[in-house]
Amino acid sequence: MVKISFQPAVAGIKGDKADKASASAPAPASATEILLTPAREEQLPQHRSKRGSSVGGVCYLSMGMVVLLMGLVFASVYIYRYFFLAQLARDNFFRCGVLYEDSLSSQVRTQMELEEDVKIYLDENYERINVPVPQFGGGDPADIIHDFQRGLTAYHDISLDKCYVIELNTTIVLPPRNFWELLMNVKRGTYLPQTYIIQEEMVVTEHVSDKEALGSFIYHLCNGKDTYRLRRRATRRRINKRGAKNCNAIRHFENTFVVETLICGVV
């Protein structure tokens, strides 16, 4: 704001001395003041600078929030991959064993021990079992897959390096969720409670050429190996020593009991 003042002019000079004397003395006169307000254009740069600084602050704040959110996302992914998935994998992997009475090999019941590694894939709905070489005989080492999506079971006899495929027997094999719950309940101990053994007999029927039709899980197990289909023998018969020469046994468990799978007519 600008302030401008003006002094008033003398109107006239009187002839007499009194008037001259009075006129010679300066008389107080009211000054005229004019107030000038600065033009609006002169104030705009100040407002523009303030507005620009506020917009810049908002941009920096937004960028900071984006960086913070990205950091939280990457931290969550890291924790999920390296902690949650690792814990989930540990919960789905079991190294366990079972004690059972062997009433098949001899007339005298002897106590046997069977160990196996079990991986249960709940989302994919299949089970993978690895039976190592038995310490006291009684069967071949094998890798077994129970694919509940395809309804198939595949046996990879490691001794023969051959694969055998048959329809999944749901009366013997527990579904992944039930089998997982069973193993979680006994995870505190090393072995399952002492149990018994049953026997099932399979017969080789035909060679399988198209392994991809068996599903991806069985395909990866049997790819590059001779693969045959099996048929479950309807009537059980006692396998004597002479007949057992043409059969291979795989002992495993996917339930509360042990199963001996005899694969006869092995090519």
UniProtKB/Swiss-Prot annotation:
Residues 136-230 form the BRICHOS domain. GO terms for biological process: negative regulation of amyloid precursor protein biosynthetic process; negative regulation of neuron projection development; neuron differentiation; positive regulation of extrinsic apoptotic signaling pathway. Pfam families: BRICHOS. Disulfide bonds join 163-222. The chain crosses the membrane at residues 55-75. One of its GO terms (molecular function) is amyloid-beta binding. It is found in: Lysosome membrane; Cell membrane. Type I membrane-bound, as well as soluble, furin has a pre-eminent role in ITM2C proteolytic processing. PCSK7 and PCSK5 may also be involved although to a lesser extent. The soluble form of PCSK7 is incapable of processing ITM2C. Fails to undergo shedding by ADAM10 and intramembrane cleavage by SPPL2B. It comes from the Eukaryota. Glycans are attached at residue 169. Negative regulator of amyloid-beta peptide production. May inhibit the processing of APP by blocking its access to alpha- and beta-secretase. Binding to the beta-secretase-cleaved APP C-terminal fragment is negligible, suggesting that ITM2C is a poor gamma-secretase cleavage inhibitor. May play a role in TNF-induced cell death and neuronal differentiation. This is Integral membrane protein 2C. It comes from Pongo abelii (Sumatran orangutan). The gene is ITM2C.
